[in-house]
Amino acid sequence: MKKIDAHAHIGVFGGWAKLSLTADELIAQMNEFDIEKTLLCSQPNELCLDAVNKYPDRILGMVYPNPYDGQKAVDMIYDYVQNKGFKGIKCNPLKQAYVADDEIMDPIMQAAEDLDIPVFMHCGHPPYSLPWSIALLAERFPKVKLTMIHMGHGHGVYIDASLKMAKRYPNLYLEMSGMPMPSKIREA
C-alpha cells in the first residue's frame, strides 16, 4: 500500500517544547513508517525548497505565500510552481490575520486556477479560518481544489461544519491531521 503524508512541516516550531524537525529527520520518519512521499508546507519557502532539492523523489513542495504581498505573492507562486517544481499552495489565515474568504485571497486563488494546482488552507481558528469562510472561497473559485487542513482542528462545531461544507462543494476536500475524533474521520 502506498502512503503519502499530505501535510508536514520542517523547521523550528518554538513554544514550550522547543520542537524542531529537519528534512533529514523527516525522511528518517518517512522511512520508519513506509511513507513514500510527503507534501511539505513550511516557511520560509527557501527551507522547503532546500528539502525538495535534497529529496526530489520523496518531498513535494507547497509554496506558502502571504496574500498581503499582493502581486509579489502571485509572482512567487508562479516562480515556485513553474521553475522550482512545487505542487500547490498552503495558506494559513490565522498566522497572517485575514479571513479565509477575504478578497485578499482572490489573486492567490486565481493563480491556483490558472496553474491548475490545489490550495491547502488551515481550518478551525476563529475568526480567520472557519469552515464557512473557506466554503465561500471554494464557491467563488469552483475550479480550484481547496483542502481544509485539520478538518476543523478538533472543535466539534467546526468539524461538523467542515463535513457539511465538503459535501456541499465538490471542489472542497478534507485533510485530517491533528483530528482527535475518529468517529468524525469515519463519517468523512
Could you tell me what each predicted segment is?
Residues 1-49:
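An N-terminally biased module of ancient metal coordination in phosphate/nucleic-acid-related enzymes
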Residues 10, 14-16, 65-68, 94-97, ...:
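Short histidine/acidic/glycine/proline-rich micro-motifs that form metal-
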Residues 17-21, 42, 71, 99, ...:
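Conserved phosphate-coordination/catalytic loops
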Residues 22-26, 45-50, 72-77, 130-135, ...:
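Alpha-helical scaffolding within the catalytic cores
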Residues 28-33, 50-54, 79-83, 136-137, ...:
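A generic secondary-structure signal
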Residues 36-37, 45-126, 168, 172-175:
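Active-site gating/metal-coordination segments in enzymes
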Residues 101-188:
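Catalytic pocket-lining loop regions of alpha/beta-barrel enzymes
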